[in-house]
Amino acid sequence: MCIRDSLFSILTLIGGLALFLYGMNAMGDGLAKVSGGKLEKILENLTSNPIKAVLLGAGVTAVIQSSSATTVMVVGFVNSGIMKLSQAVGVIMGANIGTTITSWILSLTGIQSDNFIIQMFKPTSFSPVLAIIGVIFILFINDSKKKDIGSIFIGFAILMYGMDMMSSAVKPLAEVPEFTNLLLKFSNPLLGVIAGALLTAVIQSSSASVGILQALCLTGAVPFSAAIPIIMGQNIGTCITAILSAIGAKKNAKRAAAVHLYFNLIGTVIFMTVFYLINAVVGFSFFHQAATPAGIAVIHSVFNVTATIILLPFAKGLEKLACLTIRDKKEDVVVSAEDREFMILEPRFLEKPAFAVEQSRNAARKMAEESHNALFTALSLVDKYSEEGVERVENMESKVDRYEDELGTYLVKLSHKDISEADSHSLSIMLHCIGDFERISDHAVNIMESAQELYEKGLKFSENAKKDLEVLGQAVEDIVNTAYEVFDKQDMKLAEKIEPLEEVIDELSKEVKRRHVQRLRNGECTIEMGFILSDITTCLERVADHCSNIGVCVTQVNEDLYDTHSHLNIVKSHPDETFYHELEDARIKYQLS
């Protein structure tokens, strides 16, 4: 083999590897978008049953085609407090089993038969068809879900084409003595493990490194004696991704990464010790035979399943070993309940955008709940003042401010990721609405301060003023609850109730102020009380305006329209029957006595 041919083979091998990795990444991204964060949600809600944890870890990894992605997610779950370390152990073991599905798919490249039906199972036969379907889905179908499915098909086709390129590039190497001698050196268990670990650590994908090994096997120059230790090393090397992810994380997250490493290290030691002892006594007939892609898949699966069966009963021991390695320190900061609440905005989840969007929704719901509670706690202080209530409102408003800051920053980072059309809509709605939630909590503080002023000055509203405020407060509670439900469910039909109700609240606010002026003329009220009443009604009116913003935002984003003022002008200047009907219902429901 001349230098020119060798150089061409190396370039083809590198090019094939590049296509292989790109295809795997494209397929993984497509699968993640199609799942819409549901797989990660399943992991998040798993029970403490270790067998169920293993099965879930295997299932999720088999679908997303990456044990590294699963373990990084697990590190993120543990770091955010969503998952306990004890739960993580089973998922990590399952992830190792789930990743073997890729090697079984890639083993199809080794099919050798003249039978037409069997030939159709060979990836080179059906990959072009998948590529054509994928292109049609992406270019000619205007549906984001179909486009994501198209990405999966094209990713798979590119992956298989890359695998075929690698196989073609290494086939001539079988005739090069130096190459075959190099592979034989990996029959030394230690060298084989190191080689497999280094290769996987560099490309950070055990599936890809196993694929490379399967491509090399097609030369017929890789004996099982070399393939077995390389596979063991590949399982160890894949731990680097979780270890890197755990840098800067909390202790338990680092322990989760340590569990992954210990599982593969201990599993490798046990498997290789038993295997080589039996081989020394019995002598496996296949040991010095040329490995095949299917043989690689079998070894990969047998190792991971066997290691899980052996070590699952000792899951607590792995957990303790990780805790002994990464010890608690006296000076370790205890995480407060509030800080734990914000851990759902885990930076590691940004690598799984669909799940990060779902976590952002959860945070936005909690933010909305806090602003809702702050508002109606503040309103209750007008009639029944308490210092405890004041403190609660201040704490809730402070938490809402923090949500706006941290969630807003998180959403901006998330907006730079590749997300589906549906998630993009959700992201836009959240970015628009968190400002309204924050302003509602600010109005809650203003109402609380008005209640404080009433209490400190020994003032009380008249019974008529109280009744007026009660009706206005009920209308505002109705619009706030409706707006928050519209935000949560993105319910376009329910959003139609908001604008008529907002108009009624404007009418009520004006009427409450007019009635106060009348009472002032009759000597039933004071100017000072009037200022406080006006402040409270104005705040409630502003709250209704923010609810209107939320309703309009949900409607506009879902219709791909972003001109809020034009939308409101059209709704109010050209109201339809639904608007009139809702308006009359609200007027009847909220009447001042």
Regions found by a protein language model. Name each.
Residues 41, 51-59, 82-92, 117-118, ...:
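The feature identifies polytopic integral membrane transport proteins across all domains of life
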Residues 83, 109, 222, 248-254, ...:
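Cytosolic, long alpha-helical scaffolding segments
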Residues 73-95, 103-125, 163, 200-237, ...:
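Membrane-interfacial helix-loop connectors
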Residues 24-33, 74-81, 133-147, 242-248:
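C-terminal ends of transmembrane helices
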Residues 1-5:
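Conserved small/polar residues in nucleotide/adenosyl-binding loops
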Residues 15-73, 114-120, 143, 147-218:
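Membrane-embedded alpha-helical segments and adjacent helix-loop junctions characteristic
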